[in-house]
Amino acid sequence: MSRRTTAKKRLAVPDPIYNSRLVSMLTVRILQQGKKHLAQRIIYQALDIIKERTGEDALNILETAVRKVTPLVEVKARRIGGSTYQVPMEVRAFRGTNLALRWITKYSKERSGKSMAMKLANEIMDAVNETGNSVRKREEVHKMAEANKAFAHYRF
């Protein structure tokens, strides 16, 4: 084992336009091949599309979407006596937000459509309306945790 001290958790630097850590975390999720400017442009275009459609503040809508996709519990594999159990665990706030952003970007990439900004905007709007694949994924994770509630006492 390493004798070094554990590395300090670095918080995401807020993005330049909205001054939001959530937008910068989403930028990192969309980022491909180090093209951060392109990732930021996609997100800003998606937020503009959302603002045009709803007439409300796009950042508030993004925060609502992330809140509705964030899981409260998840299952983790735990090996006990030769068999593996799916043990339900509470999700910490930062991990929950990260999972929500991961699912939103994953399912927006899988959508059919022309531009990534449009696909991302549609996925965010669907998340706010509690439809779409990212919300379905959250429900799936919650169902798995509910089904394996009997193994909750194996929590570590």
Swiss-Prot record:
Recorded name of the encoding gene: rps7
Alphabetical list of Pfam families matching this protein: Ribosomal_S7 (PF00177)
InterPro entries named in the record: Ribosomal_uS7, Ribosomal_uS7_bac/org-type, Ribosomal_uS7_CS, Ribosomal_uS7_dom, Ribosomal_uS7_dom_sf
Keyword Plastid: yes
UniProt function note: One of the primary rRNA binding proteins, it binds directly to 16S rRNA where it nucleates assembly of the head domain of the 30S subunit.
Binding partners and assembly: Part of the 30S ribosomal subunit.
Coiled-coil ranges per UniProt: none
Keyword Plastid: yes
Protein name: Small ribosomal subunit protein uS7c
Keyword list, A-Z: Chloroplast, Plastid, Ribonucleoprotein, Ribosomal protein, RNA-binding, rRNA-binding
Similarity annotation: Belongs to the universal ribosomal protein uS7 family.
Subcellular location: Plastid, Chloroplast
GO cellular component, one term: small ribosomal subunit
